[in-house]
Amino acid sequence: MFDFQHQLKILPDKPGVYIMKNSLGEVIYVGKAKVLKNRVRQYFQNSKNHSEKVRAMVKNIAEFEYIVTDSEMEALILECNLIKKYSPRYNIALKDDKFYPFIKITTNEDFPRVYVTRNFAKDGNRYFGPYTNGTAVYEVMGLIKKLFPLRTCKKAIVEGGEPTRACLNYHINLCKAPCAGYISKAEYWEMIDEIINILNGTDTSIIKKLKLEMEKAAEELEFEKAAKIRDRILAIELISEKQKMFTVKEGDEDFIDLYTDEKDGCAQVFFVREGKVTGREHFMIENISDDPVKEVISSFIASFYGGTAQIPKTIYVPEEIEDQELIEKFLTEKRGSKVWIKVPKKGDKKNLLDMVRNNAKIMLDQFKEKMVEEKELNKSALTELADVLGLDSLPARIEAYDISNIQGVDSVGTMVVFENGKAKNSDYRRFKIKSVKGPNDYESMREILSRRFSHGLEEVNKIKERNLEYSKGKFCIFPDLIMMDGGKGQVNIALEVLKDFGIEIPVCGLVKDHKHRTRGIIFNNEEILIRRGSGLMNLITRVQDEVHRYAITYHRSLRDKRTLHSILEDIPRIGEKRRRNLLMKFGSIDNIKKASMEELLDTPGIDKRAAESIKQYFSS
C-alpha cells in the first residue's frame, strides 16, 4: 500500500516532474514543479480551493512518483515529453493534435533522399517546415520530383560502393541511378544544393542562371529546350512562393487566443508572415471550463511549439500566461534567438487577436454542432440495433473481436470498442495467441475472450476490495453488446466463455452473402436482415472495418518484426541493441547483407569483430 504521508514528507525541495497514477497503475496526470515538495503537497491540502477537475483527479490518485531535474527548464521539457508519451486523462488534451509535416533531406548520406516526414529529429539532416497546410507540402514535393531526378529508395548507397542494377525509375527518367554508379556524388550534390537553396528561398542566382540559358536557347532557335527551361523556372518560382508561407523570419508573428463555453474550449492560432495572415490552425480542448485561461494557454504553447522545429520571434496572447518567463526561455532555446510573448493592449495587433478569438468561437460552435449531429445519427443507429435485437436499453458500449493469422503463424486477436456509436481507441486491446497452435480461429477466439473477461473480473474485484472509486481500467468496464465478426460458430464460443464466468452479455454475429459482404445479424440463432445503406448497416460496417484494420495492422507488425529479427538473431556477437542499430541504419536485411565493412563499422555499436561476424554469416 502506498504510504502518502511518508512520501509527501520526503519530497525534495528541487525542481522536477511528478507523475500521478490510479489504482491500476495508469498515469492520469503529469506536472512540473519549481519545488517538488511544495507543488505536490498542494494537491492533498485545501481541497476547497481546487477546481472540480482537480478534486476528481485527487480522488483517483492511488500513488505518485517524481523525477528530479537540474532546472525548471529541464522539468518543462520532460513534462512535455511525458505528456506526449502517456496522454494522461487529466492533462489538457488537444483533440486535433497533430505533428506537422516537414520536408527532410538526408544530408548525412552520400546520395541524399528528399521526402515528407512528420517526425522532426536532431539527427544531422536538413528539415524544412513545418507545413501547416498538408496539401502544400505535397505540392512542393511533387514539383521537386519533376525538377530533380533523385533516388527514392532506402538503399545504403555510398560512393565507390558495389553497383547494383538500376530500377524502373532510372528508365523513366525519375532517378539518376546512383546505386548503379551512373552519377557521381559531386554531380548528385549539385541537385541537392539547388533544392536546399530553393527551399531556403534566399538564393535567386538559380533563376537568373536559368533565364540566361533560356534566352540563349531561344536565340539559337532551340525553342523546345527554351520551353523546358521556362517550365523549370515557373516551377522553382512556385516552390519559392509556397515556401514563403512556411519560412519563419525575423519579423514573423503568431497570434493565439482561446474561447471556452461551459465545458470545452478551442485554441486558435493565426500565422502572420511578412505582415499577412498566411494560415491558421485550431485545436479542441475538452473539460477546461474550470481552468484559468493563463494556465490553458501556457500548456497549449508548450505542447504546440514543443513539436515544431521553427518558432516565430513574437507570440501574441490575450493575457499574461502562467510561467511566462520559463516558456519564453524554453522557446528561445529552441529557436536559437530571443522569443517574446506579448499581450497587445490596442491597435492592429489587438484587433487581430480579437479576430482570432472570434474564429475560435466559430470553430467551437461548428465542432459542437457536428458533435450533436453525429450523436443523433449514432443514437438513431443504436436505437435501431436495440429494436432489432430486442434489447431493453441502447447498447452504449459495443465490443468487437477479430482473429488474424497466416496459416496459424503470428496469430493475434484484437478487441475494438465503440461507445455511443463512436470508436474509442483508448480502450482497444490486442492479444498474442498463446495456447493455440495452428490456424484455429474458434479456439483462438475462446482464448482472447477468456483472457479479456478474466482480467476484467480481477480488476473489478480489486477495486471493490480496496473500496476505491470505480476507475476506468484496462478491462473493468464490460460491454452492453458483443459483436462477433464471424457467424454462429463464433457467437457460440463467446456465449460459452461468458457462461463459464457467470456473465450475461448479449452476443450477436455478422452474416455474409456469397460475395462476403455483410447482409445481416445473427442473434439467438435467428438471422436478421439489415437494409443496406441504413444507419444501422453503416454503424455495423464501421465496427467491422475497424476491427479488421486493427487486427491486420497488429498481425503485420508482429510478422515484420519476426522476419527482420529472426535472421539477425542467428548472427554471433549481434545482440538486441546491435540488431536495432543495424535495422535503423540499413532498413532491411538485404541492405545489411550488401553493406561493406566500412558501412558496417560506421554503424553505432558495431566494432570490427561484430562487422566481420556479419560478413562471415552472410557469405557462408
UniProtKB/Swiss-Prot annotation:
Residues 204-239 form the UVR domain. GO terms for cellular component: cytoplasm; excinuclease repair complex. One of its GO terms (biological process) is nucleotide-excision repair. Pfam families: GIY-YIG, HHH_2, UVR, UvrC_RNaseH, UvrC_RNaseH_dom. Keywords: Cytoplasm, DNA damage, DNA excision, DNA repair, Excision nuclease, SOS response. It comes from the Bacteria. Residues 13-92 form the GIY-YIG domain. One of its GO terms (molecular function) is excinuclease ABC activity. Coiled coil: none annotated. SUPFAM superfamilies: C-terminal UvrC-binding domain of UvrB, GIY-YIG endonuclease, RuvA domain 2-like. It is found in: Cytoplasm. The keyword DNA repair applies. HAMAP family: UvrC. PANTHER family: UVRABC SYSTEM PROTEIN C, UVRC/OXIDOREDUCTASE. Interacts with UvrB in an incision complex. Belongs to the UvrC family. The UvrABC repair system catalyzes the recognition and processing of DNA lesions. UvrC both incises the 5' and 3' sides of the lesion. The N-terminal half is responsible for the 3' incision and the C-terminal half is responsible for the 5' incision. This is UvrABC system protein C. It comes from Clostridium perfringens (strain ATCC 13124 / DSM 756 / JCM 1290 / NCIMB 6125 / NCTC 8237 / Type A).
